[in-house]
Amino acid sequence: MANSAQARKRVRQNNTRRQHAASQRSMIRTYIKKVDAAILAGDYDAATAAYNKAVPVIDRMADKGVIHKNKAARHKSRYNKAIKALKA
């Protein structure tokens, strides 16, 4: 348990930040699910549209440190590859 005022404040801040980051991670997952669903359906246009909406969100969360930048790059690369395979 935090005993000093400074430590109590850090606990409050960490709780707030953790909740906010959890919300942002959930948002990323929602965008990724939409891309995934469009790819599995085989719909190139829908997959491209969903991917184009998801990329800026993924990049923004990586910049903020919500997810690691390599994880963001991995998601983008894999989905881009899958979308290109739909067109071929």
From Swiss-Prot:
Q: Which cysteine pairs are joined by S-S bonds? A: none
Which family does the entry's similarity section mention?
Belongs to the bacterial ribosomal protein bS20 family.
What GO molecular function terms would the record report? small ribosomal subunit rRNA binding; structural constituent of ribosome
The record's Pfam families line, in alphabetical order, gives: Ribosomal_S20p (PF01649)
GO BP: translation
- Renumbered to this chain, region (Disordered) spans 1-25
Gene Ontology CC, one term:
small ribosomal subunit
Q: Where is the signal peptide?
A: none
Basic residues composition-biased segments? 7-20
* Keywords associated with the record: Ribonucleoprotein, Ribosomal protein, RNA-binding, rRNA-binding
UniProt-recorded name of the protein: Small ribosomal subunit protein bS20
Q: Which organism is it from?
A: Psychrobacter sp. (strain PRwf-1)
